[in-house]
Amino acid sequence: MHCPFCFAVDTKVIDSRLVGEGSSVRRRRQCLVCNERFTTFEVAELVMPRVVKSNDVREPFNEDKLRSGMLKALEKRPVSADDVEMAVNHIKTHLRGTGEREVASKMIGNLVMEQLKKLDKVAYIRFASVYRSFEDIKEFGEEIARLQD
């Protein structure tokens, strides 16, 4: 690491500690040229795959879009914010775990439906009705029947 004072390349780590519930590392460093000390923080960079939409447009993964879609389905339902965050994190972990650089938006939609089914059946039906473009009451009934199985 370059020294921020003299820009020398040679520095040594004097002390390392975990901070932020173990999600990052704080390091005290000392320059071997000018002997100045400074602090650095290391955080793992977790790259999310790009999303390939049904029309083949590619866009960066948007966690806010994922969360807002789920929250819209869960509106006025008895589900805690913590449970929603756990579901969002589960989906993100699954997407990162694929190891793919790109994932289909359809996969994300299916993961959302899977999580909503666990959280709240009404929210699941709300989301499914939009996601699967239900055309009539019969399709609602069929989906509800599948839930009851």
From Swiss-Prot:
<keyword id="KW-0067">ATP-binding</keyword>
<dbReference type="Pfam" id="PF03477">
    <property type="entry name" value="ATP-cone"/>
</dbReference>
<dbReference type="InterPro" id="IPR055173">
    <property type="entry name" value="NrdR-like_N"/>
</dbReference>
<dbReference type="InterPro" id="IPR003796">
    <property type="entry name" value="RNR_NrdR-like"/>
</dbReference>
<keyword id="KW-0479">Metal-binding</keyword>
<dbReference type="GO" id="GO:0008270">
    <property type="term" value="F:zinc ion binding"/>
</dbReference>
<comment type="function">
    <text>Negatively regulates transcription of bacterial ribonucleotide reductase nrd genes and operons by binding to NrdR-boxes.</text>
</comment>
<keyword id="KW-0805">Transcription regulation</keyword>
<feature type="zinc finger region">
    <location>
        <begin position="3"/>
        <end position="34"/>
    </location>
</feature>
<comment type="similarity">
    <text>Belongs to the NrdR family.</text>
</comment>
<dbReference type="GO" id="GO:0005524">
    <property type="term" value="F:ATP binding"/>
</dbReference>
<dbReference type="Pfam" id="PF22811">
    <property type="entry name" value="Zn_ribbon_NrdR"/>
</dbReference>
<feature type="domain" description="ATP-cone">
    <location>
        <begin position="49"/>
        <end position="139"/>
    </location>
</feature>
<keyword id="KW-0238">DNA-binding</keyword>
<keyword id="KW-0863">Zinc-finger</keyword>
<keyword id="KW-0804">Transcription</keyword>
<dbReference type="InterPro" id="IPR005144">
    <property type="entry name" value="ATP-cone_dom"/>
</dbReference>
<keyword id="KW-0678">Repressor</keyword>
<dbReference type="GO" id="GO:0003677">
    <property type="term" value="F:DNA binding"/>
</dbReference>
<dbReference type="GO" id="GO:0045892">
    <property type="term" value="P:negative regulation of DNA-templated transcription"/>
</dbReference>
<keyword id="KW-0862">Zinc</keyword>
<keyword id="KW-0547">Nucleotide-binding</keyword>
<protein>
    <recommendedName>
        <fullName>Transcriptional repressor NrdR</fullName>
    </recommendedName>
</protein>
